[in-house]
């Protein structure tokens, strides 16, 4: 569904590599094993890292096939958050549920990235409804497409900004149009309900019909992700590198830091205090 391509896009856009590899060419950073290159799939978990907004982001790329669930569990156990990549055409698959269950078992905050929104058969709205139905009201739309396919526009529902993308993944802001606001309105209720669940103050504002400010929304998103009460949904195209800037911004600004995890469970099932050292990472 695009995990390796997403990792490759992050490496390229952050400047970590100057040439973006492709799975079909067998030259991606994360699929370095000859067997992976031959089959065109990930077999084992691999580690890469990028620097973004003064934050070191460690990226653990895991296999998507159900037969390699052990690799997923091992990676999630040491991760601070889990980005679950979902195909905008086919929606929830077995691997989606396995990744969700693994992250839940280890108490790791979860984020969805709906990939392949550049495909003409993409249906973000259907996939979002599937996620909402399957995984509950913690699912929170943050970055959504207005159009899908080759001519795509994406909306940041927190900042209420619209973006276009070029062939190299670069984005630029465009004016908000009435039709963009109409699309945003379709997801705003789900967004505000999830944000309101992070504090009594926001819940009171929500039930009173008052607008949640952008500043309040940004803080609530950060706190909700850490607490596990919000599972944000982003979207884009890993191969086109669309939406990847927004995801990296979120990782650097809203995702939990290693210091957020205070304890770990040892083999005997006993909680052990942990004290992460070193530079700020995500």
Map each language-model feature to its residues:
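Structural and coupling elements of P-loop NTPases
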Residues: 1-282
């Amino acid at each position: 569904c695009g995990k390796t391509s997403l990792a490759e896009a992050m490496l390229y856009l952050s400047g970590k590599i100057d040439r973006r590899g492709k799975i079909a060419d067998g030259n991606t950073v994360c699929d370095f094993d000859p067997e992976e290159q031959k089959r065109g799939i990930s077999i084992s978990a691999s580690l890469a890292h990028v620097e973004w907004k003064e934050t070191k982001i460690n990226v653990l790329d895991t296999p998507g096939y159900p037969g390699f669930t052990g690799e997923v569990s091992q990676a999630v156990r040491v991760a601070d958050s889990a980005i679950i990549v979902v195909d905008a055409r086919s929606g929830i698959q077995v691997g989606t549920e396995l990744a969700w269950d693994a992250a839940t078992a280890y108490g790791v905050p979860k984020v969805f990235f709906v990939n392949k929104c550049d495909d003409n058969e993409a249906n973000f709205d259907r996939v979002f409804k599937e996620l909402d139905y399957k995984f509950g009201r913690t699912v929170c739309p943050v970055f959504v497409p207005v159009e899908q396919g080759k001519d795509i526009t994406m909306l940041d529902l927190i900042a209420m900004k619209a973006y276009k993308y070029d062939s190299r993944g670069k984005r630029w802001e465009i004016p908000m149009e009435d039709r963009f606001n109409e699309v945003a309105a379709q997801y705003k209720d789900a967004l505000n309900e999830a944000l309101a669940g992070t504090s009594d103050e926001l819940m009171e504002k929500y039930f009173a019909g008052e607008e949640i400010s952008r500043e309040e929304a940004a803080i609530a998103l950060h706190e909700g992700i850490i607490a596990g009460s919000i599972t944000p949904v982003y979207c884009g195209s890993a191969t086109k590198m669309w939406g990847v800037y927004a995801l990296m911004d979120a990782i650097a600004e809203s995702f939990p830091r290693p210091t957020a995890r205070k304890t770990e469970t040892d083999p005997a099932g006993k909680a052990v205090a942990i004290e992460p050292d070193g530079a700020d990472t995500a």
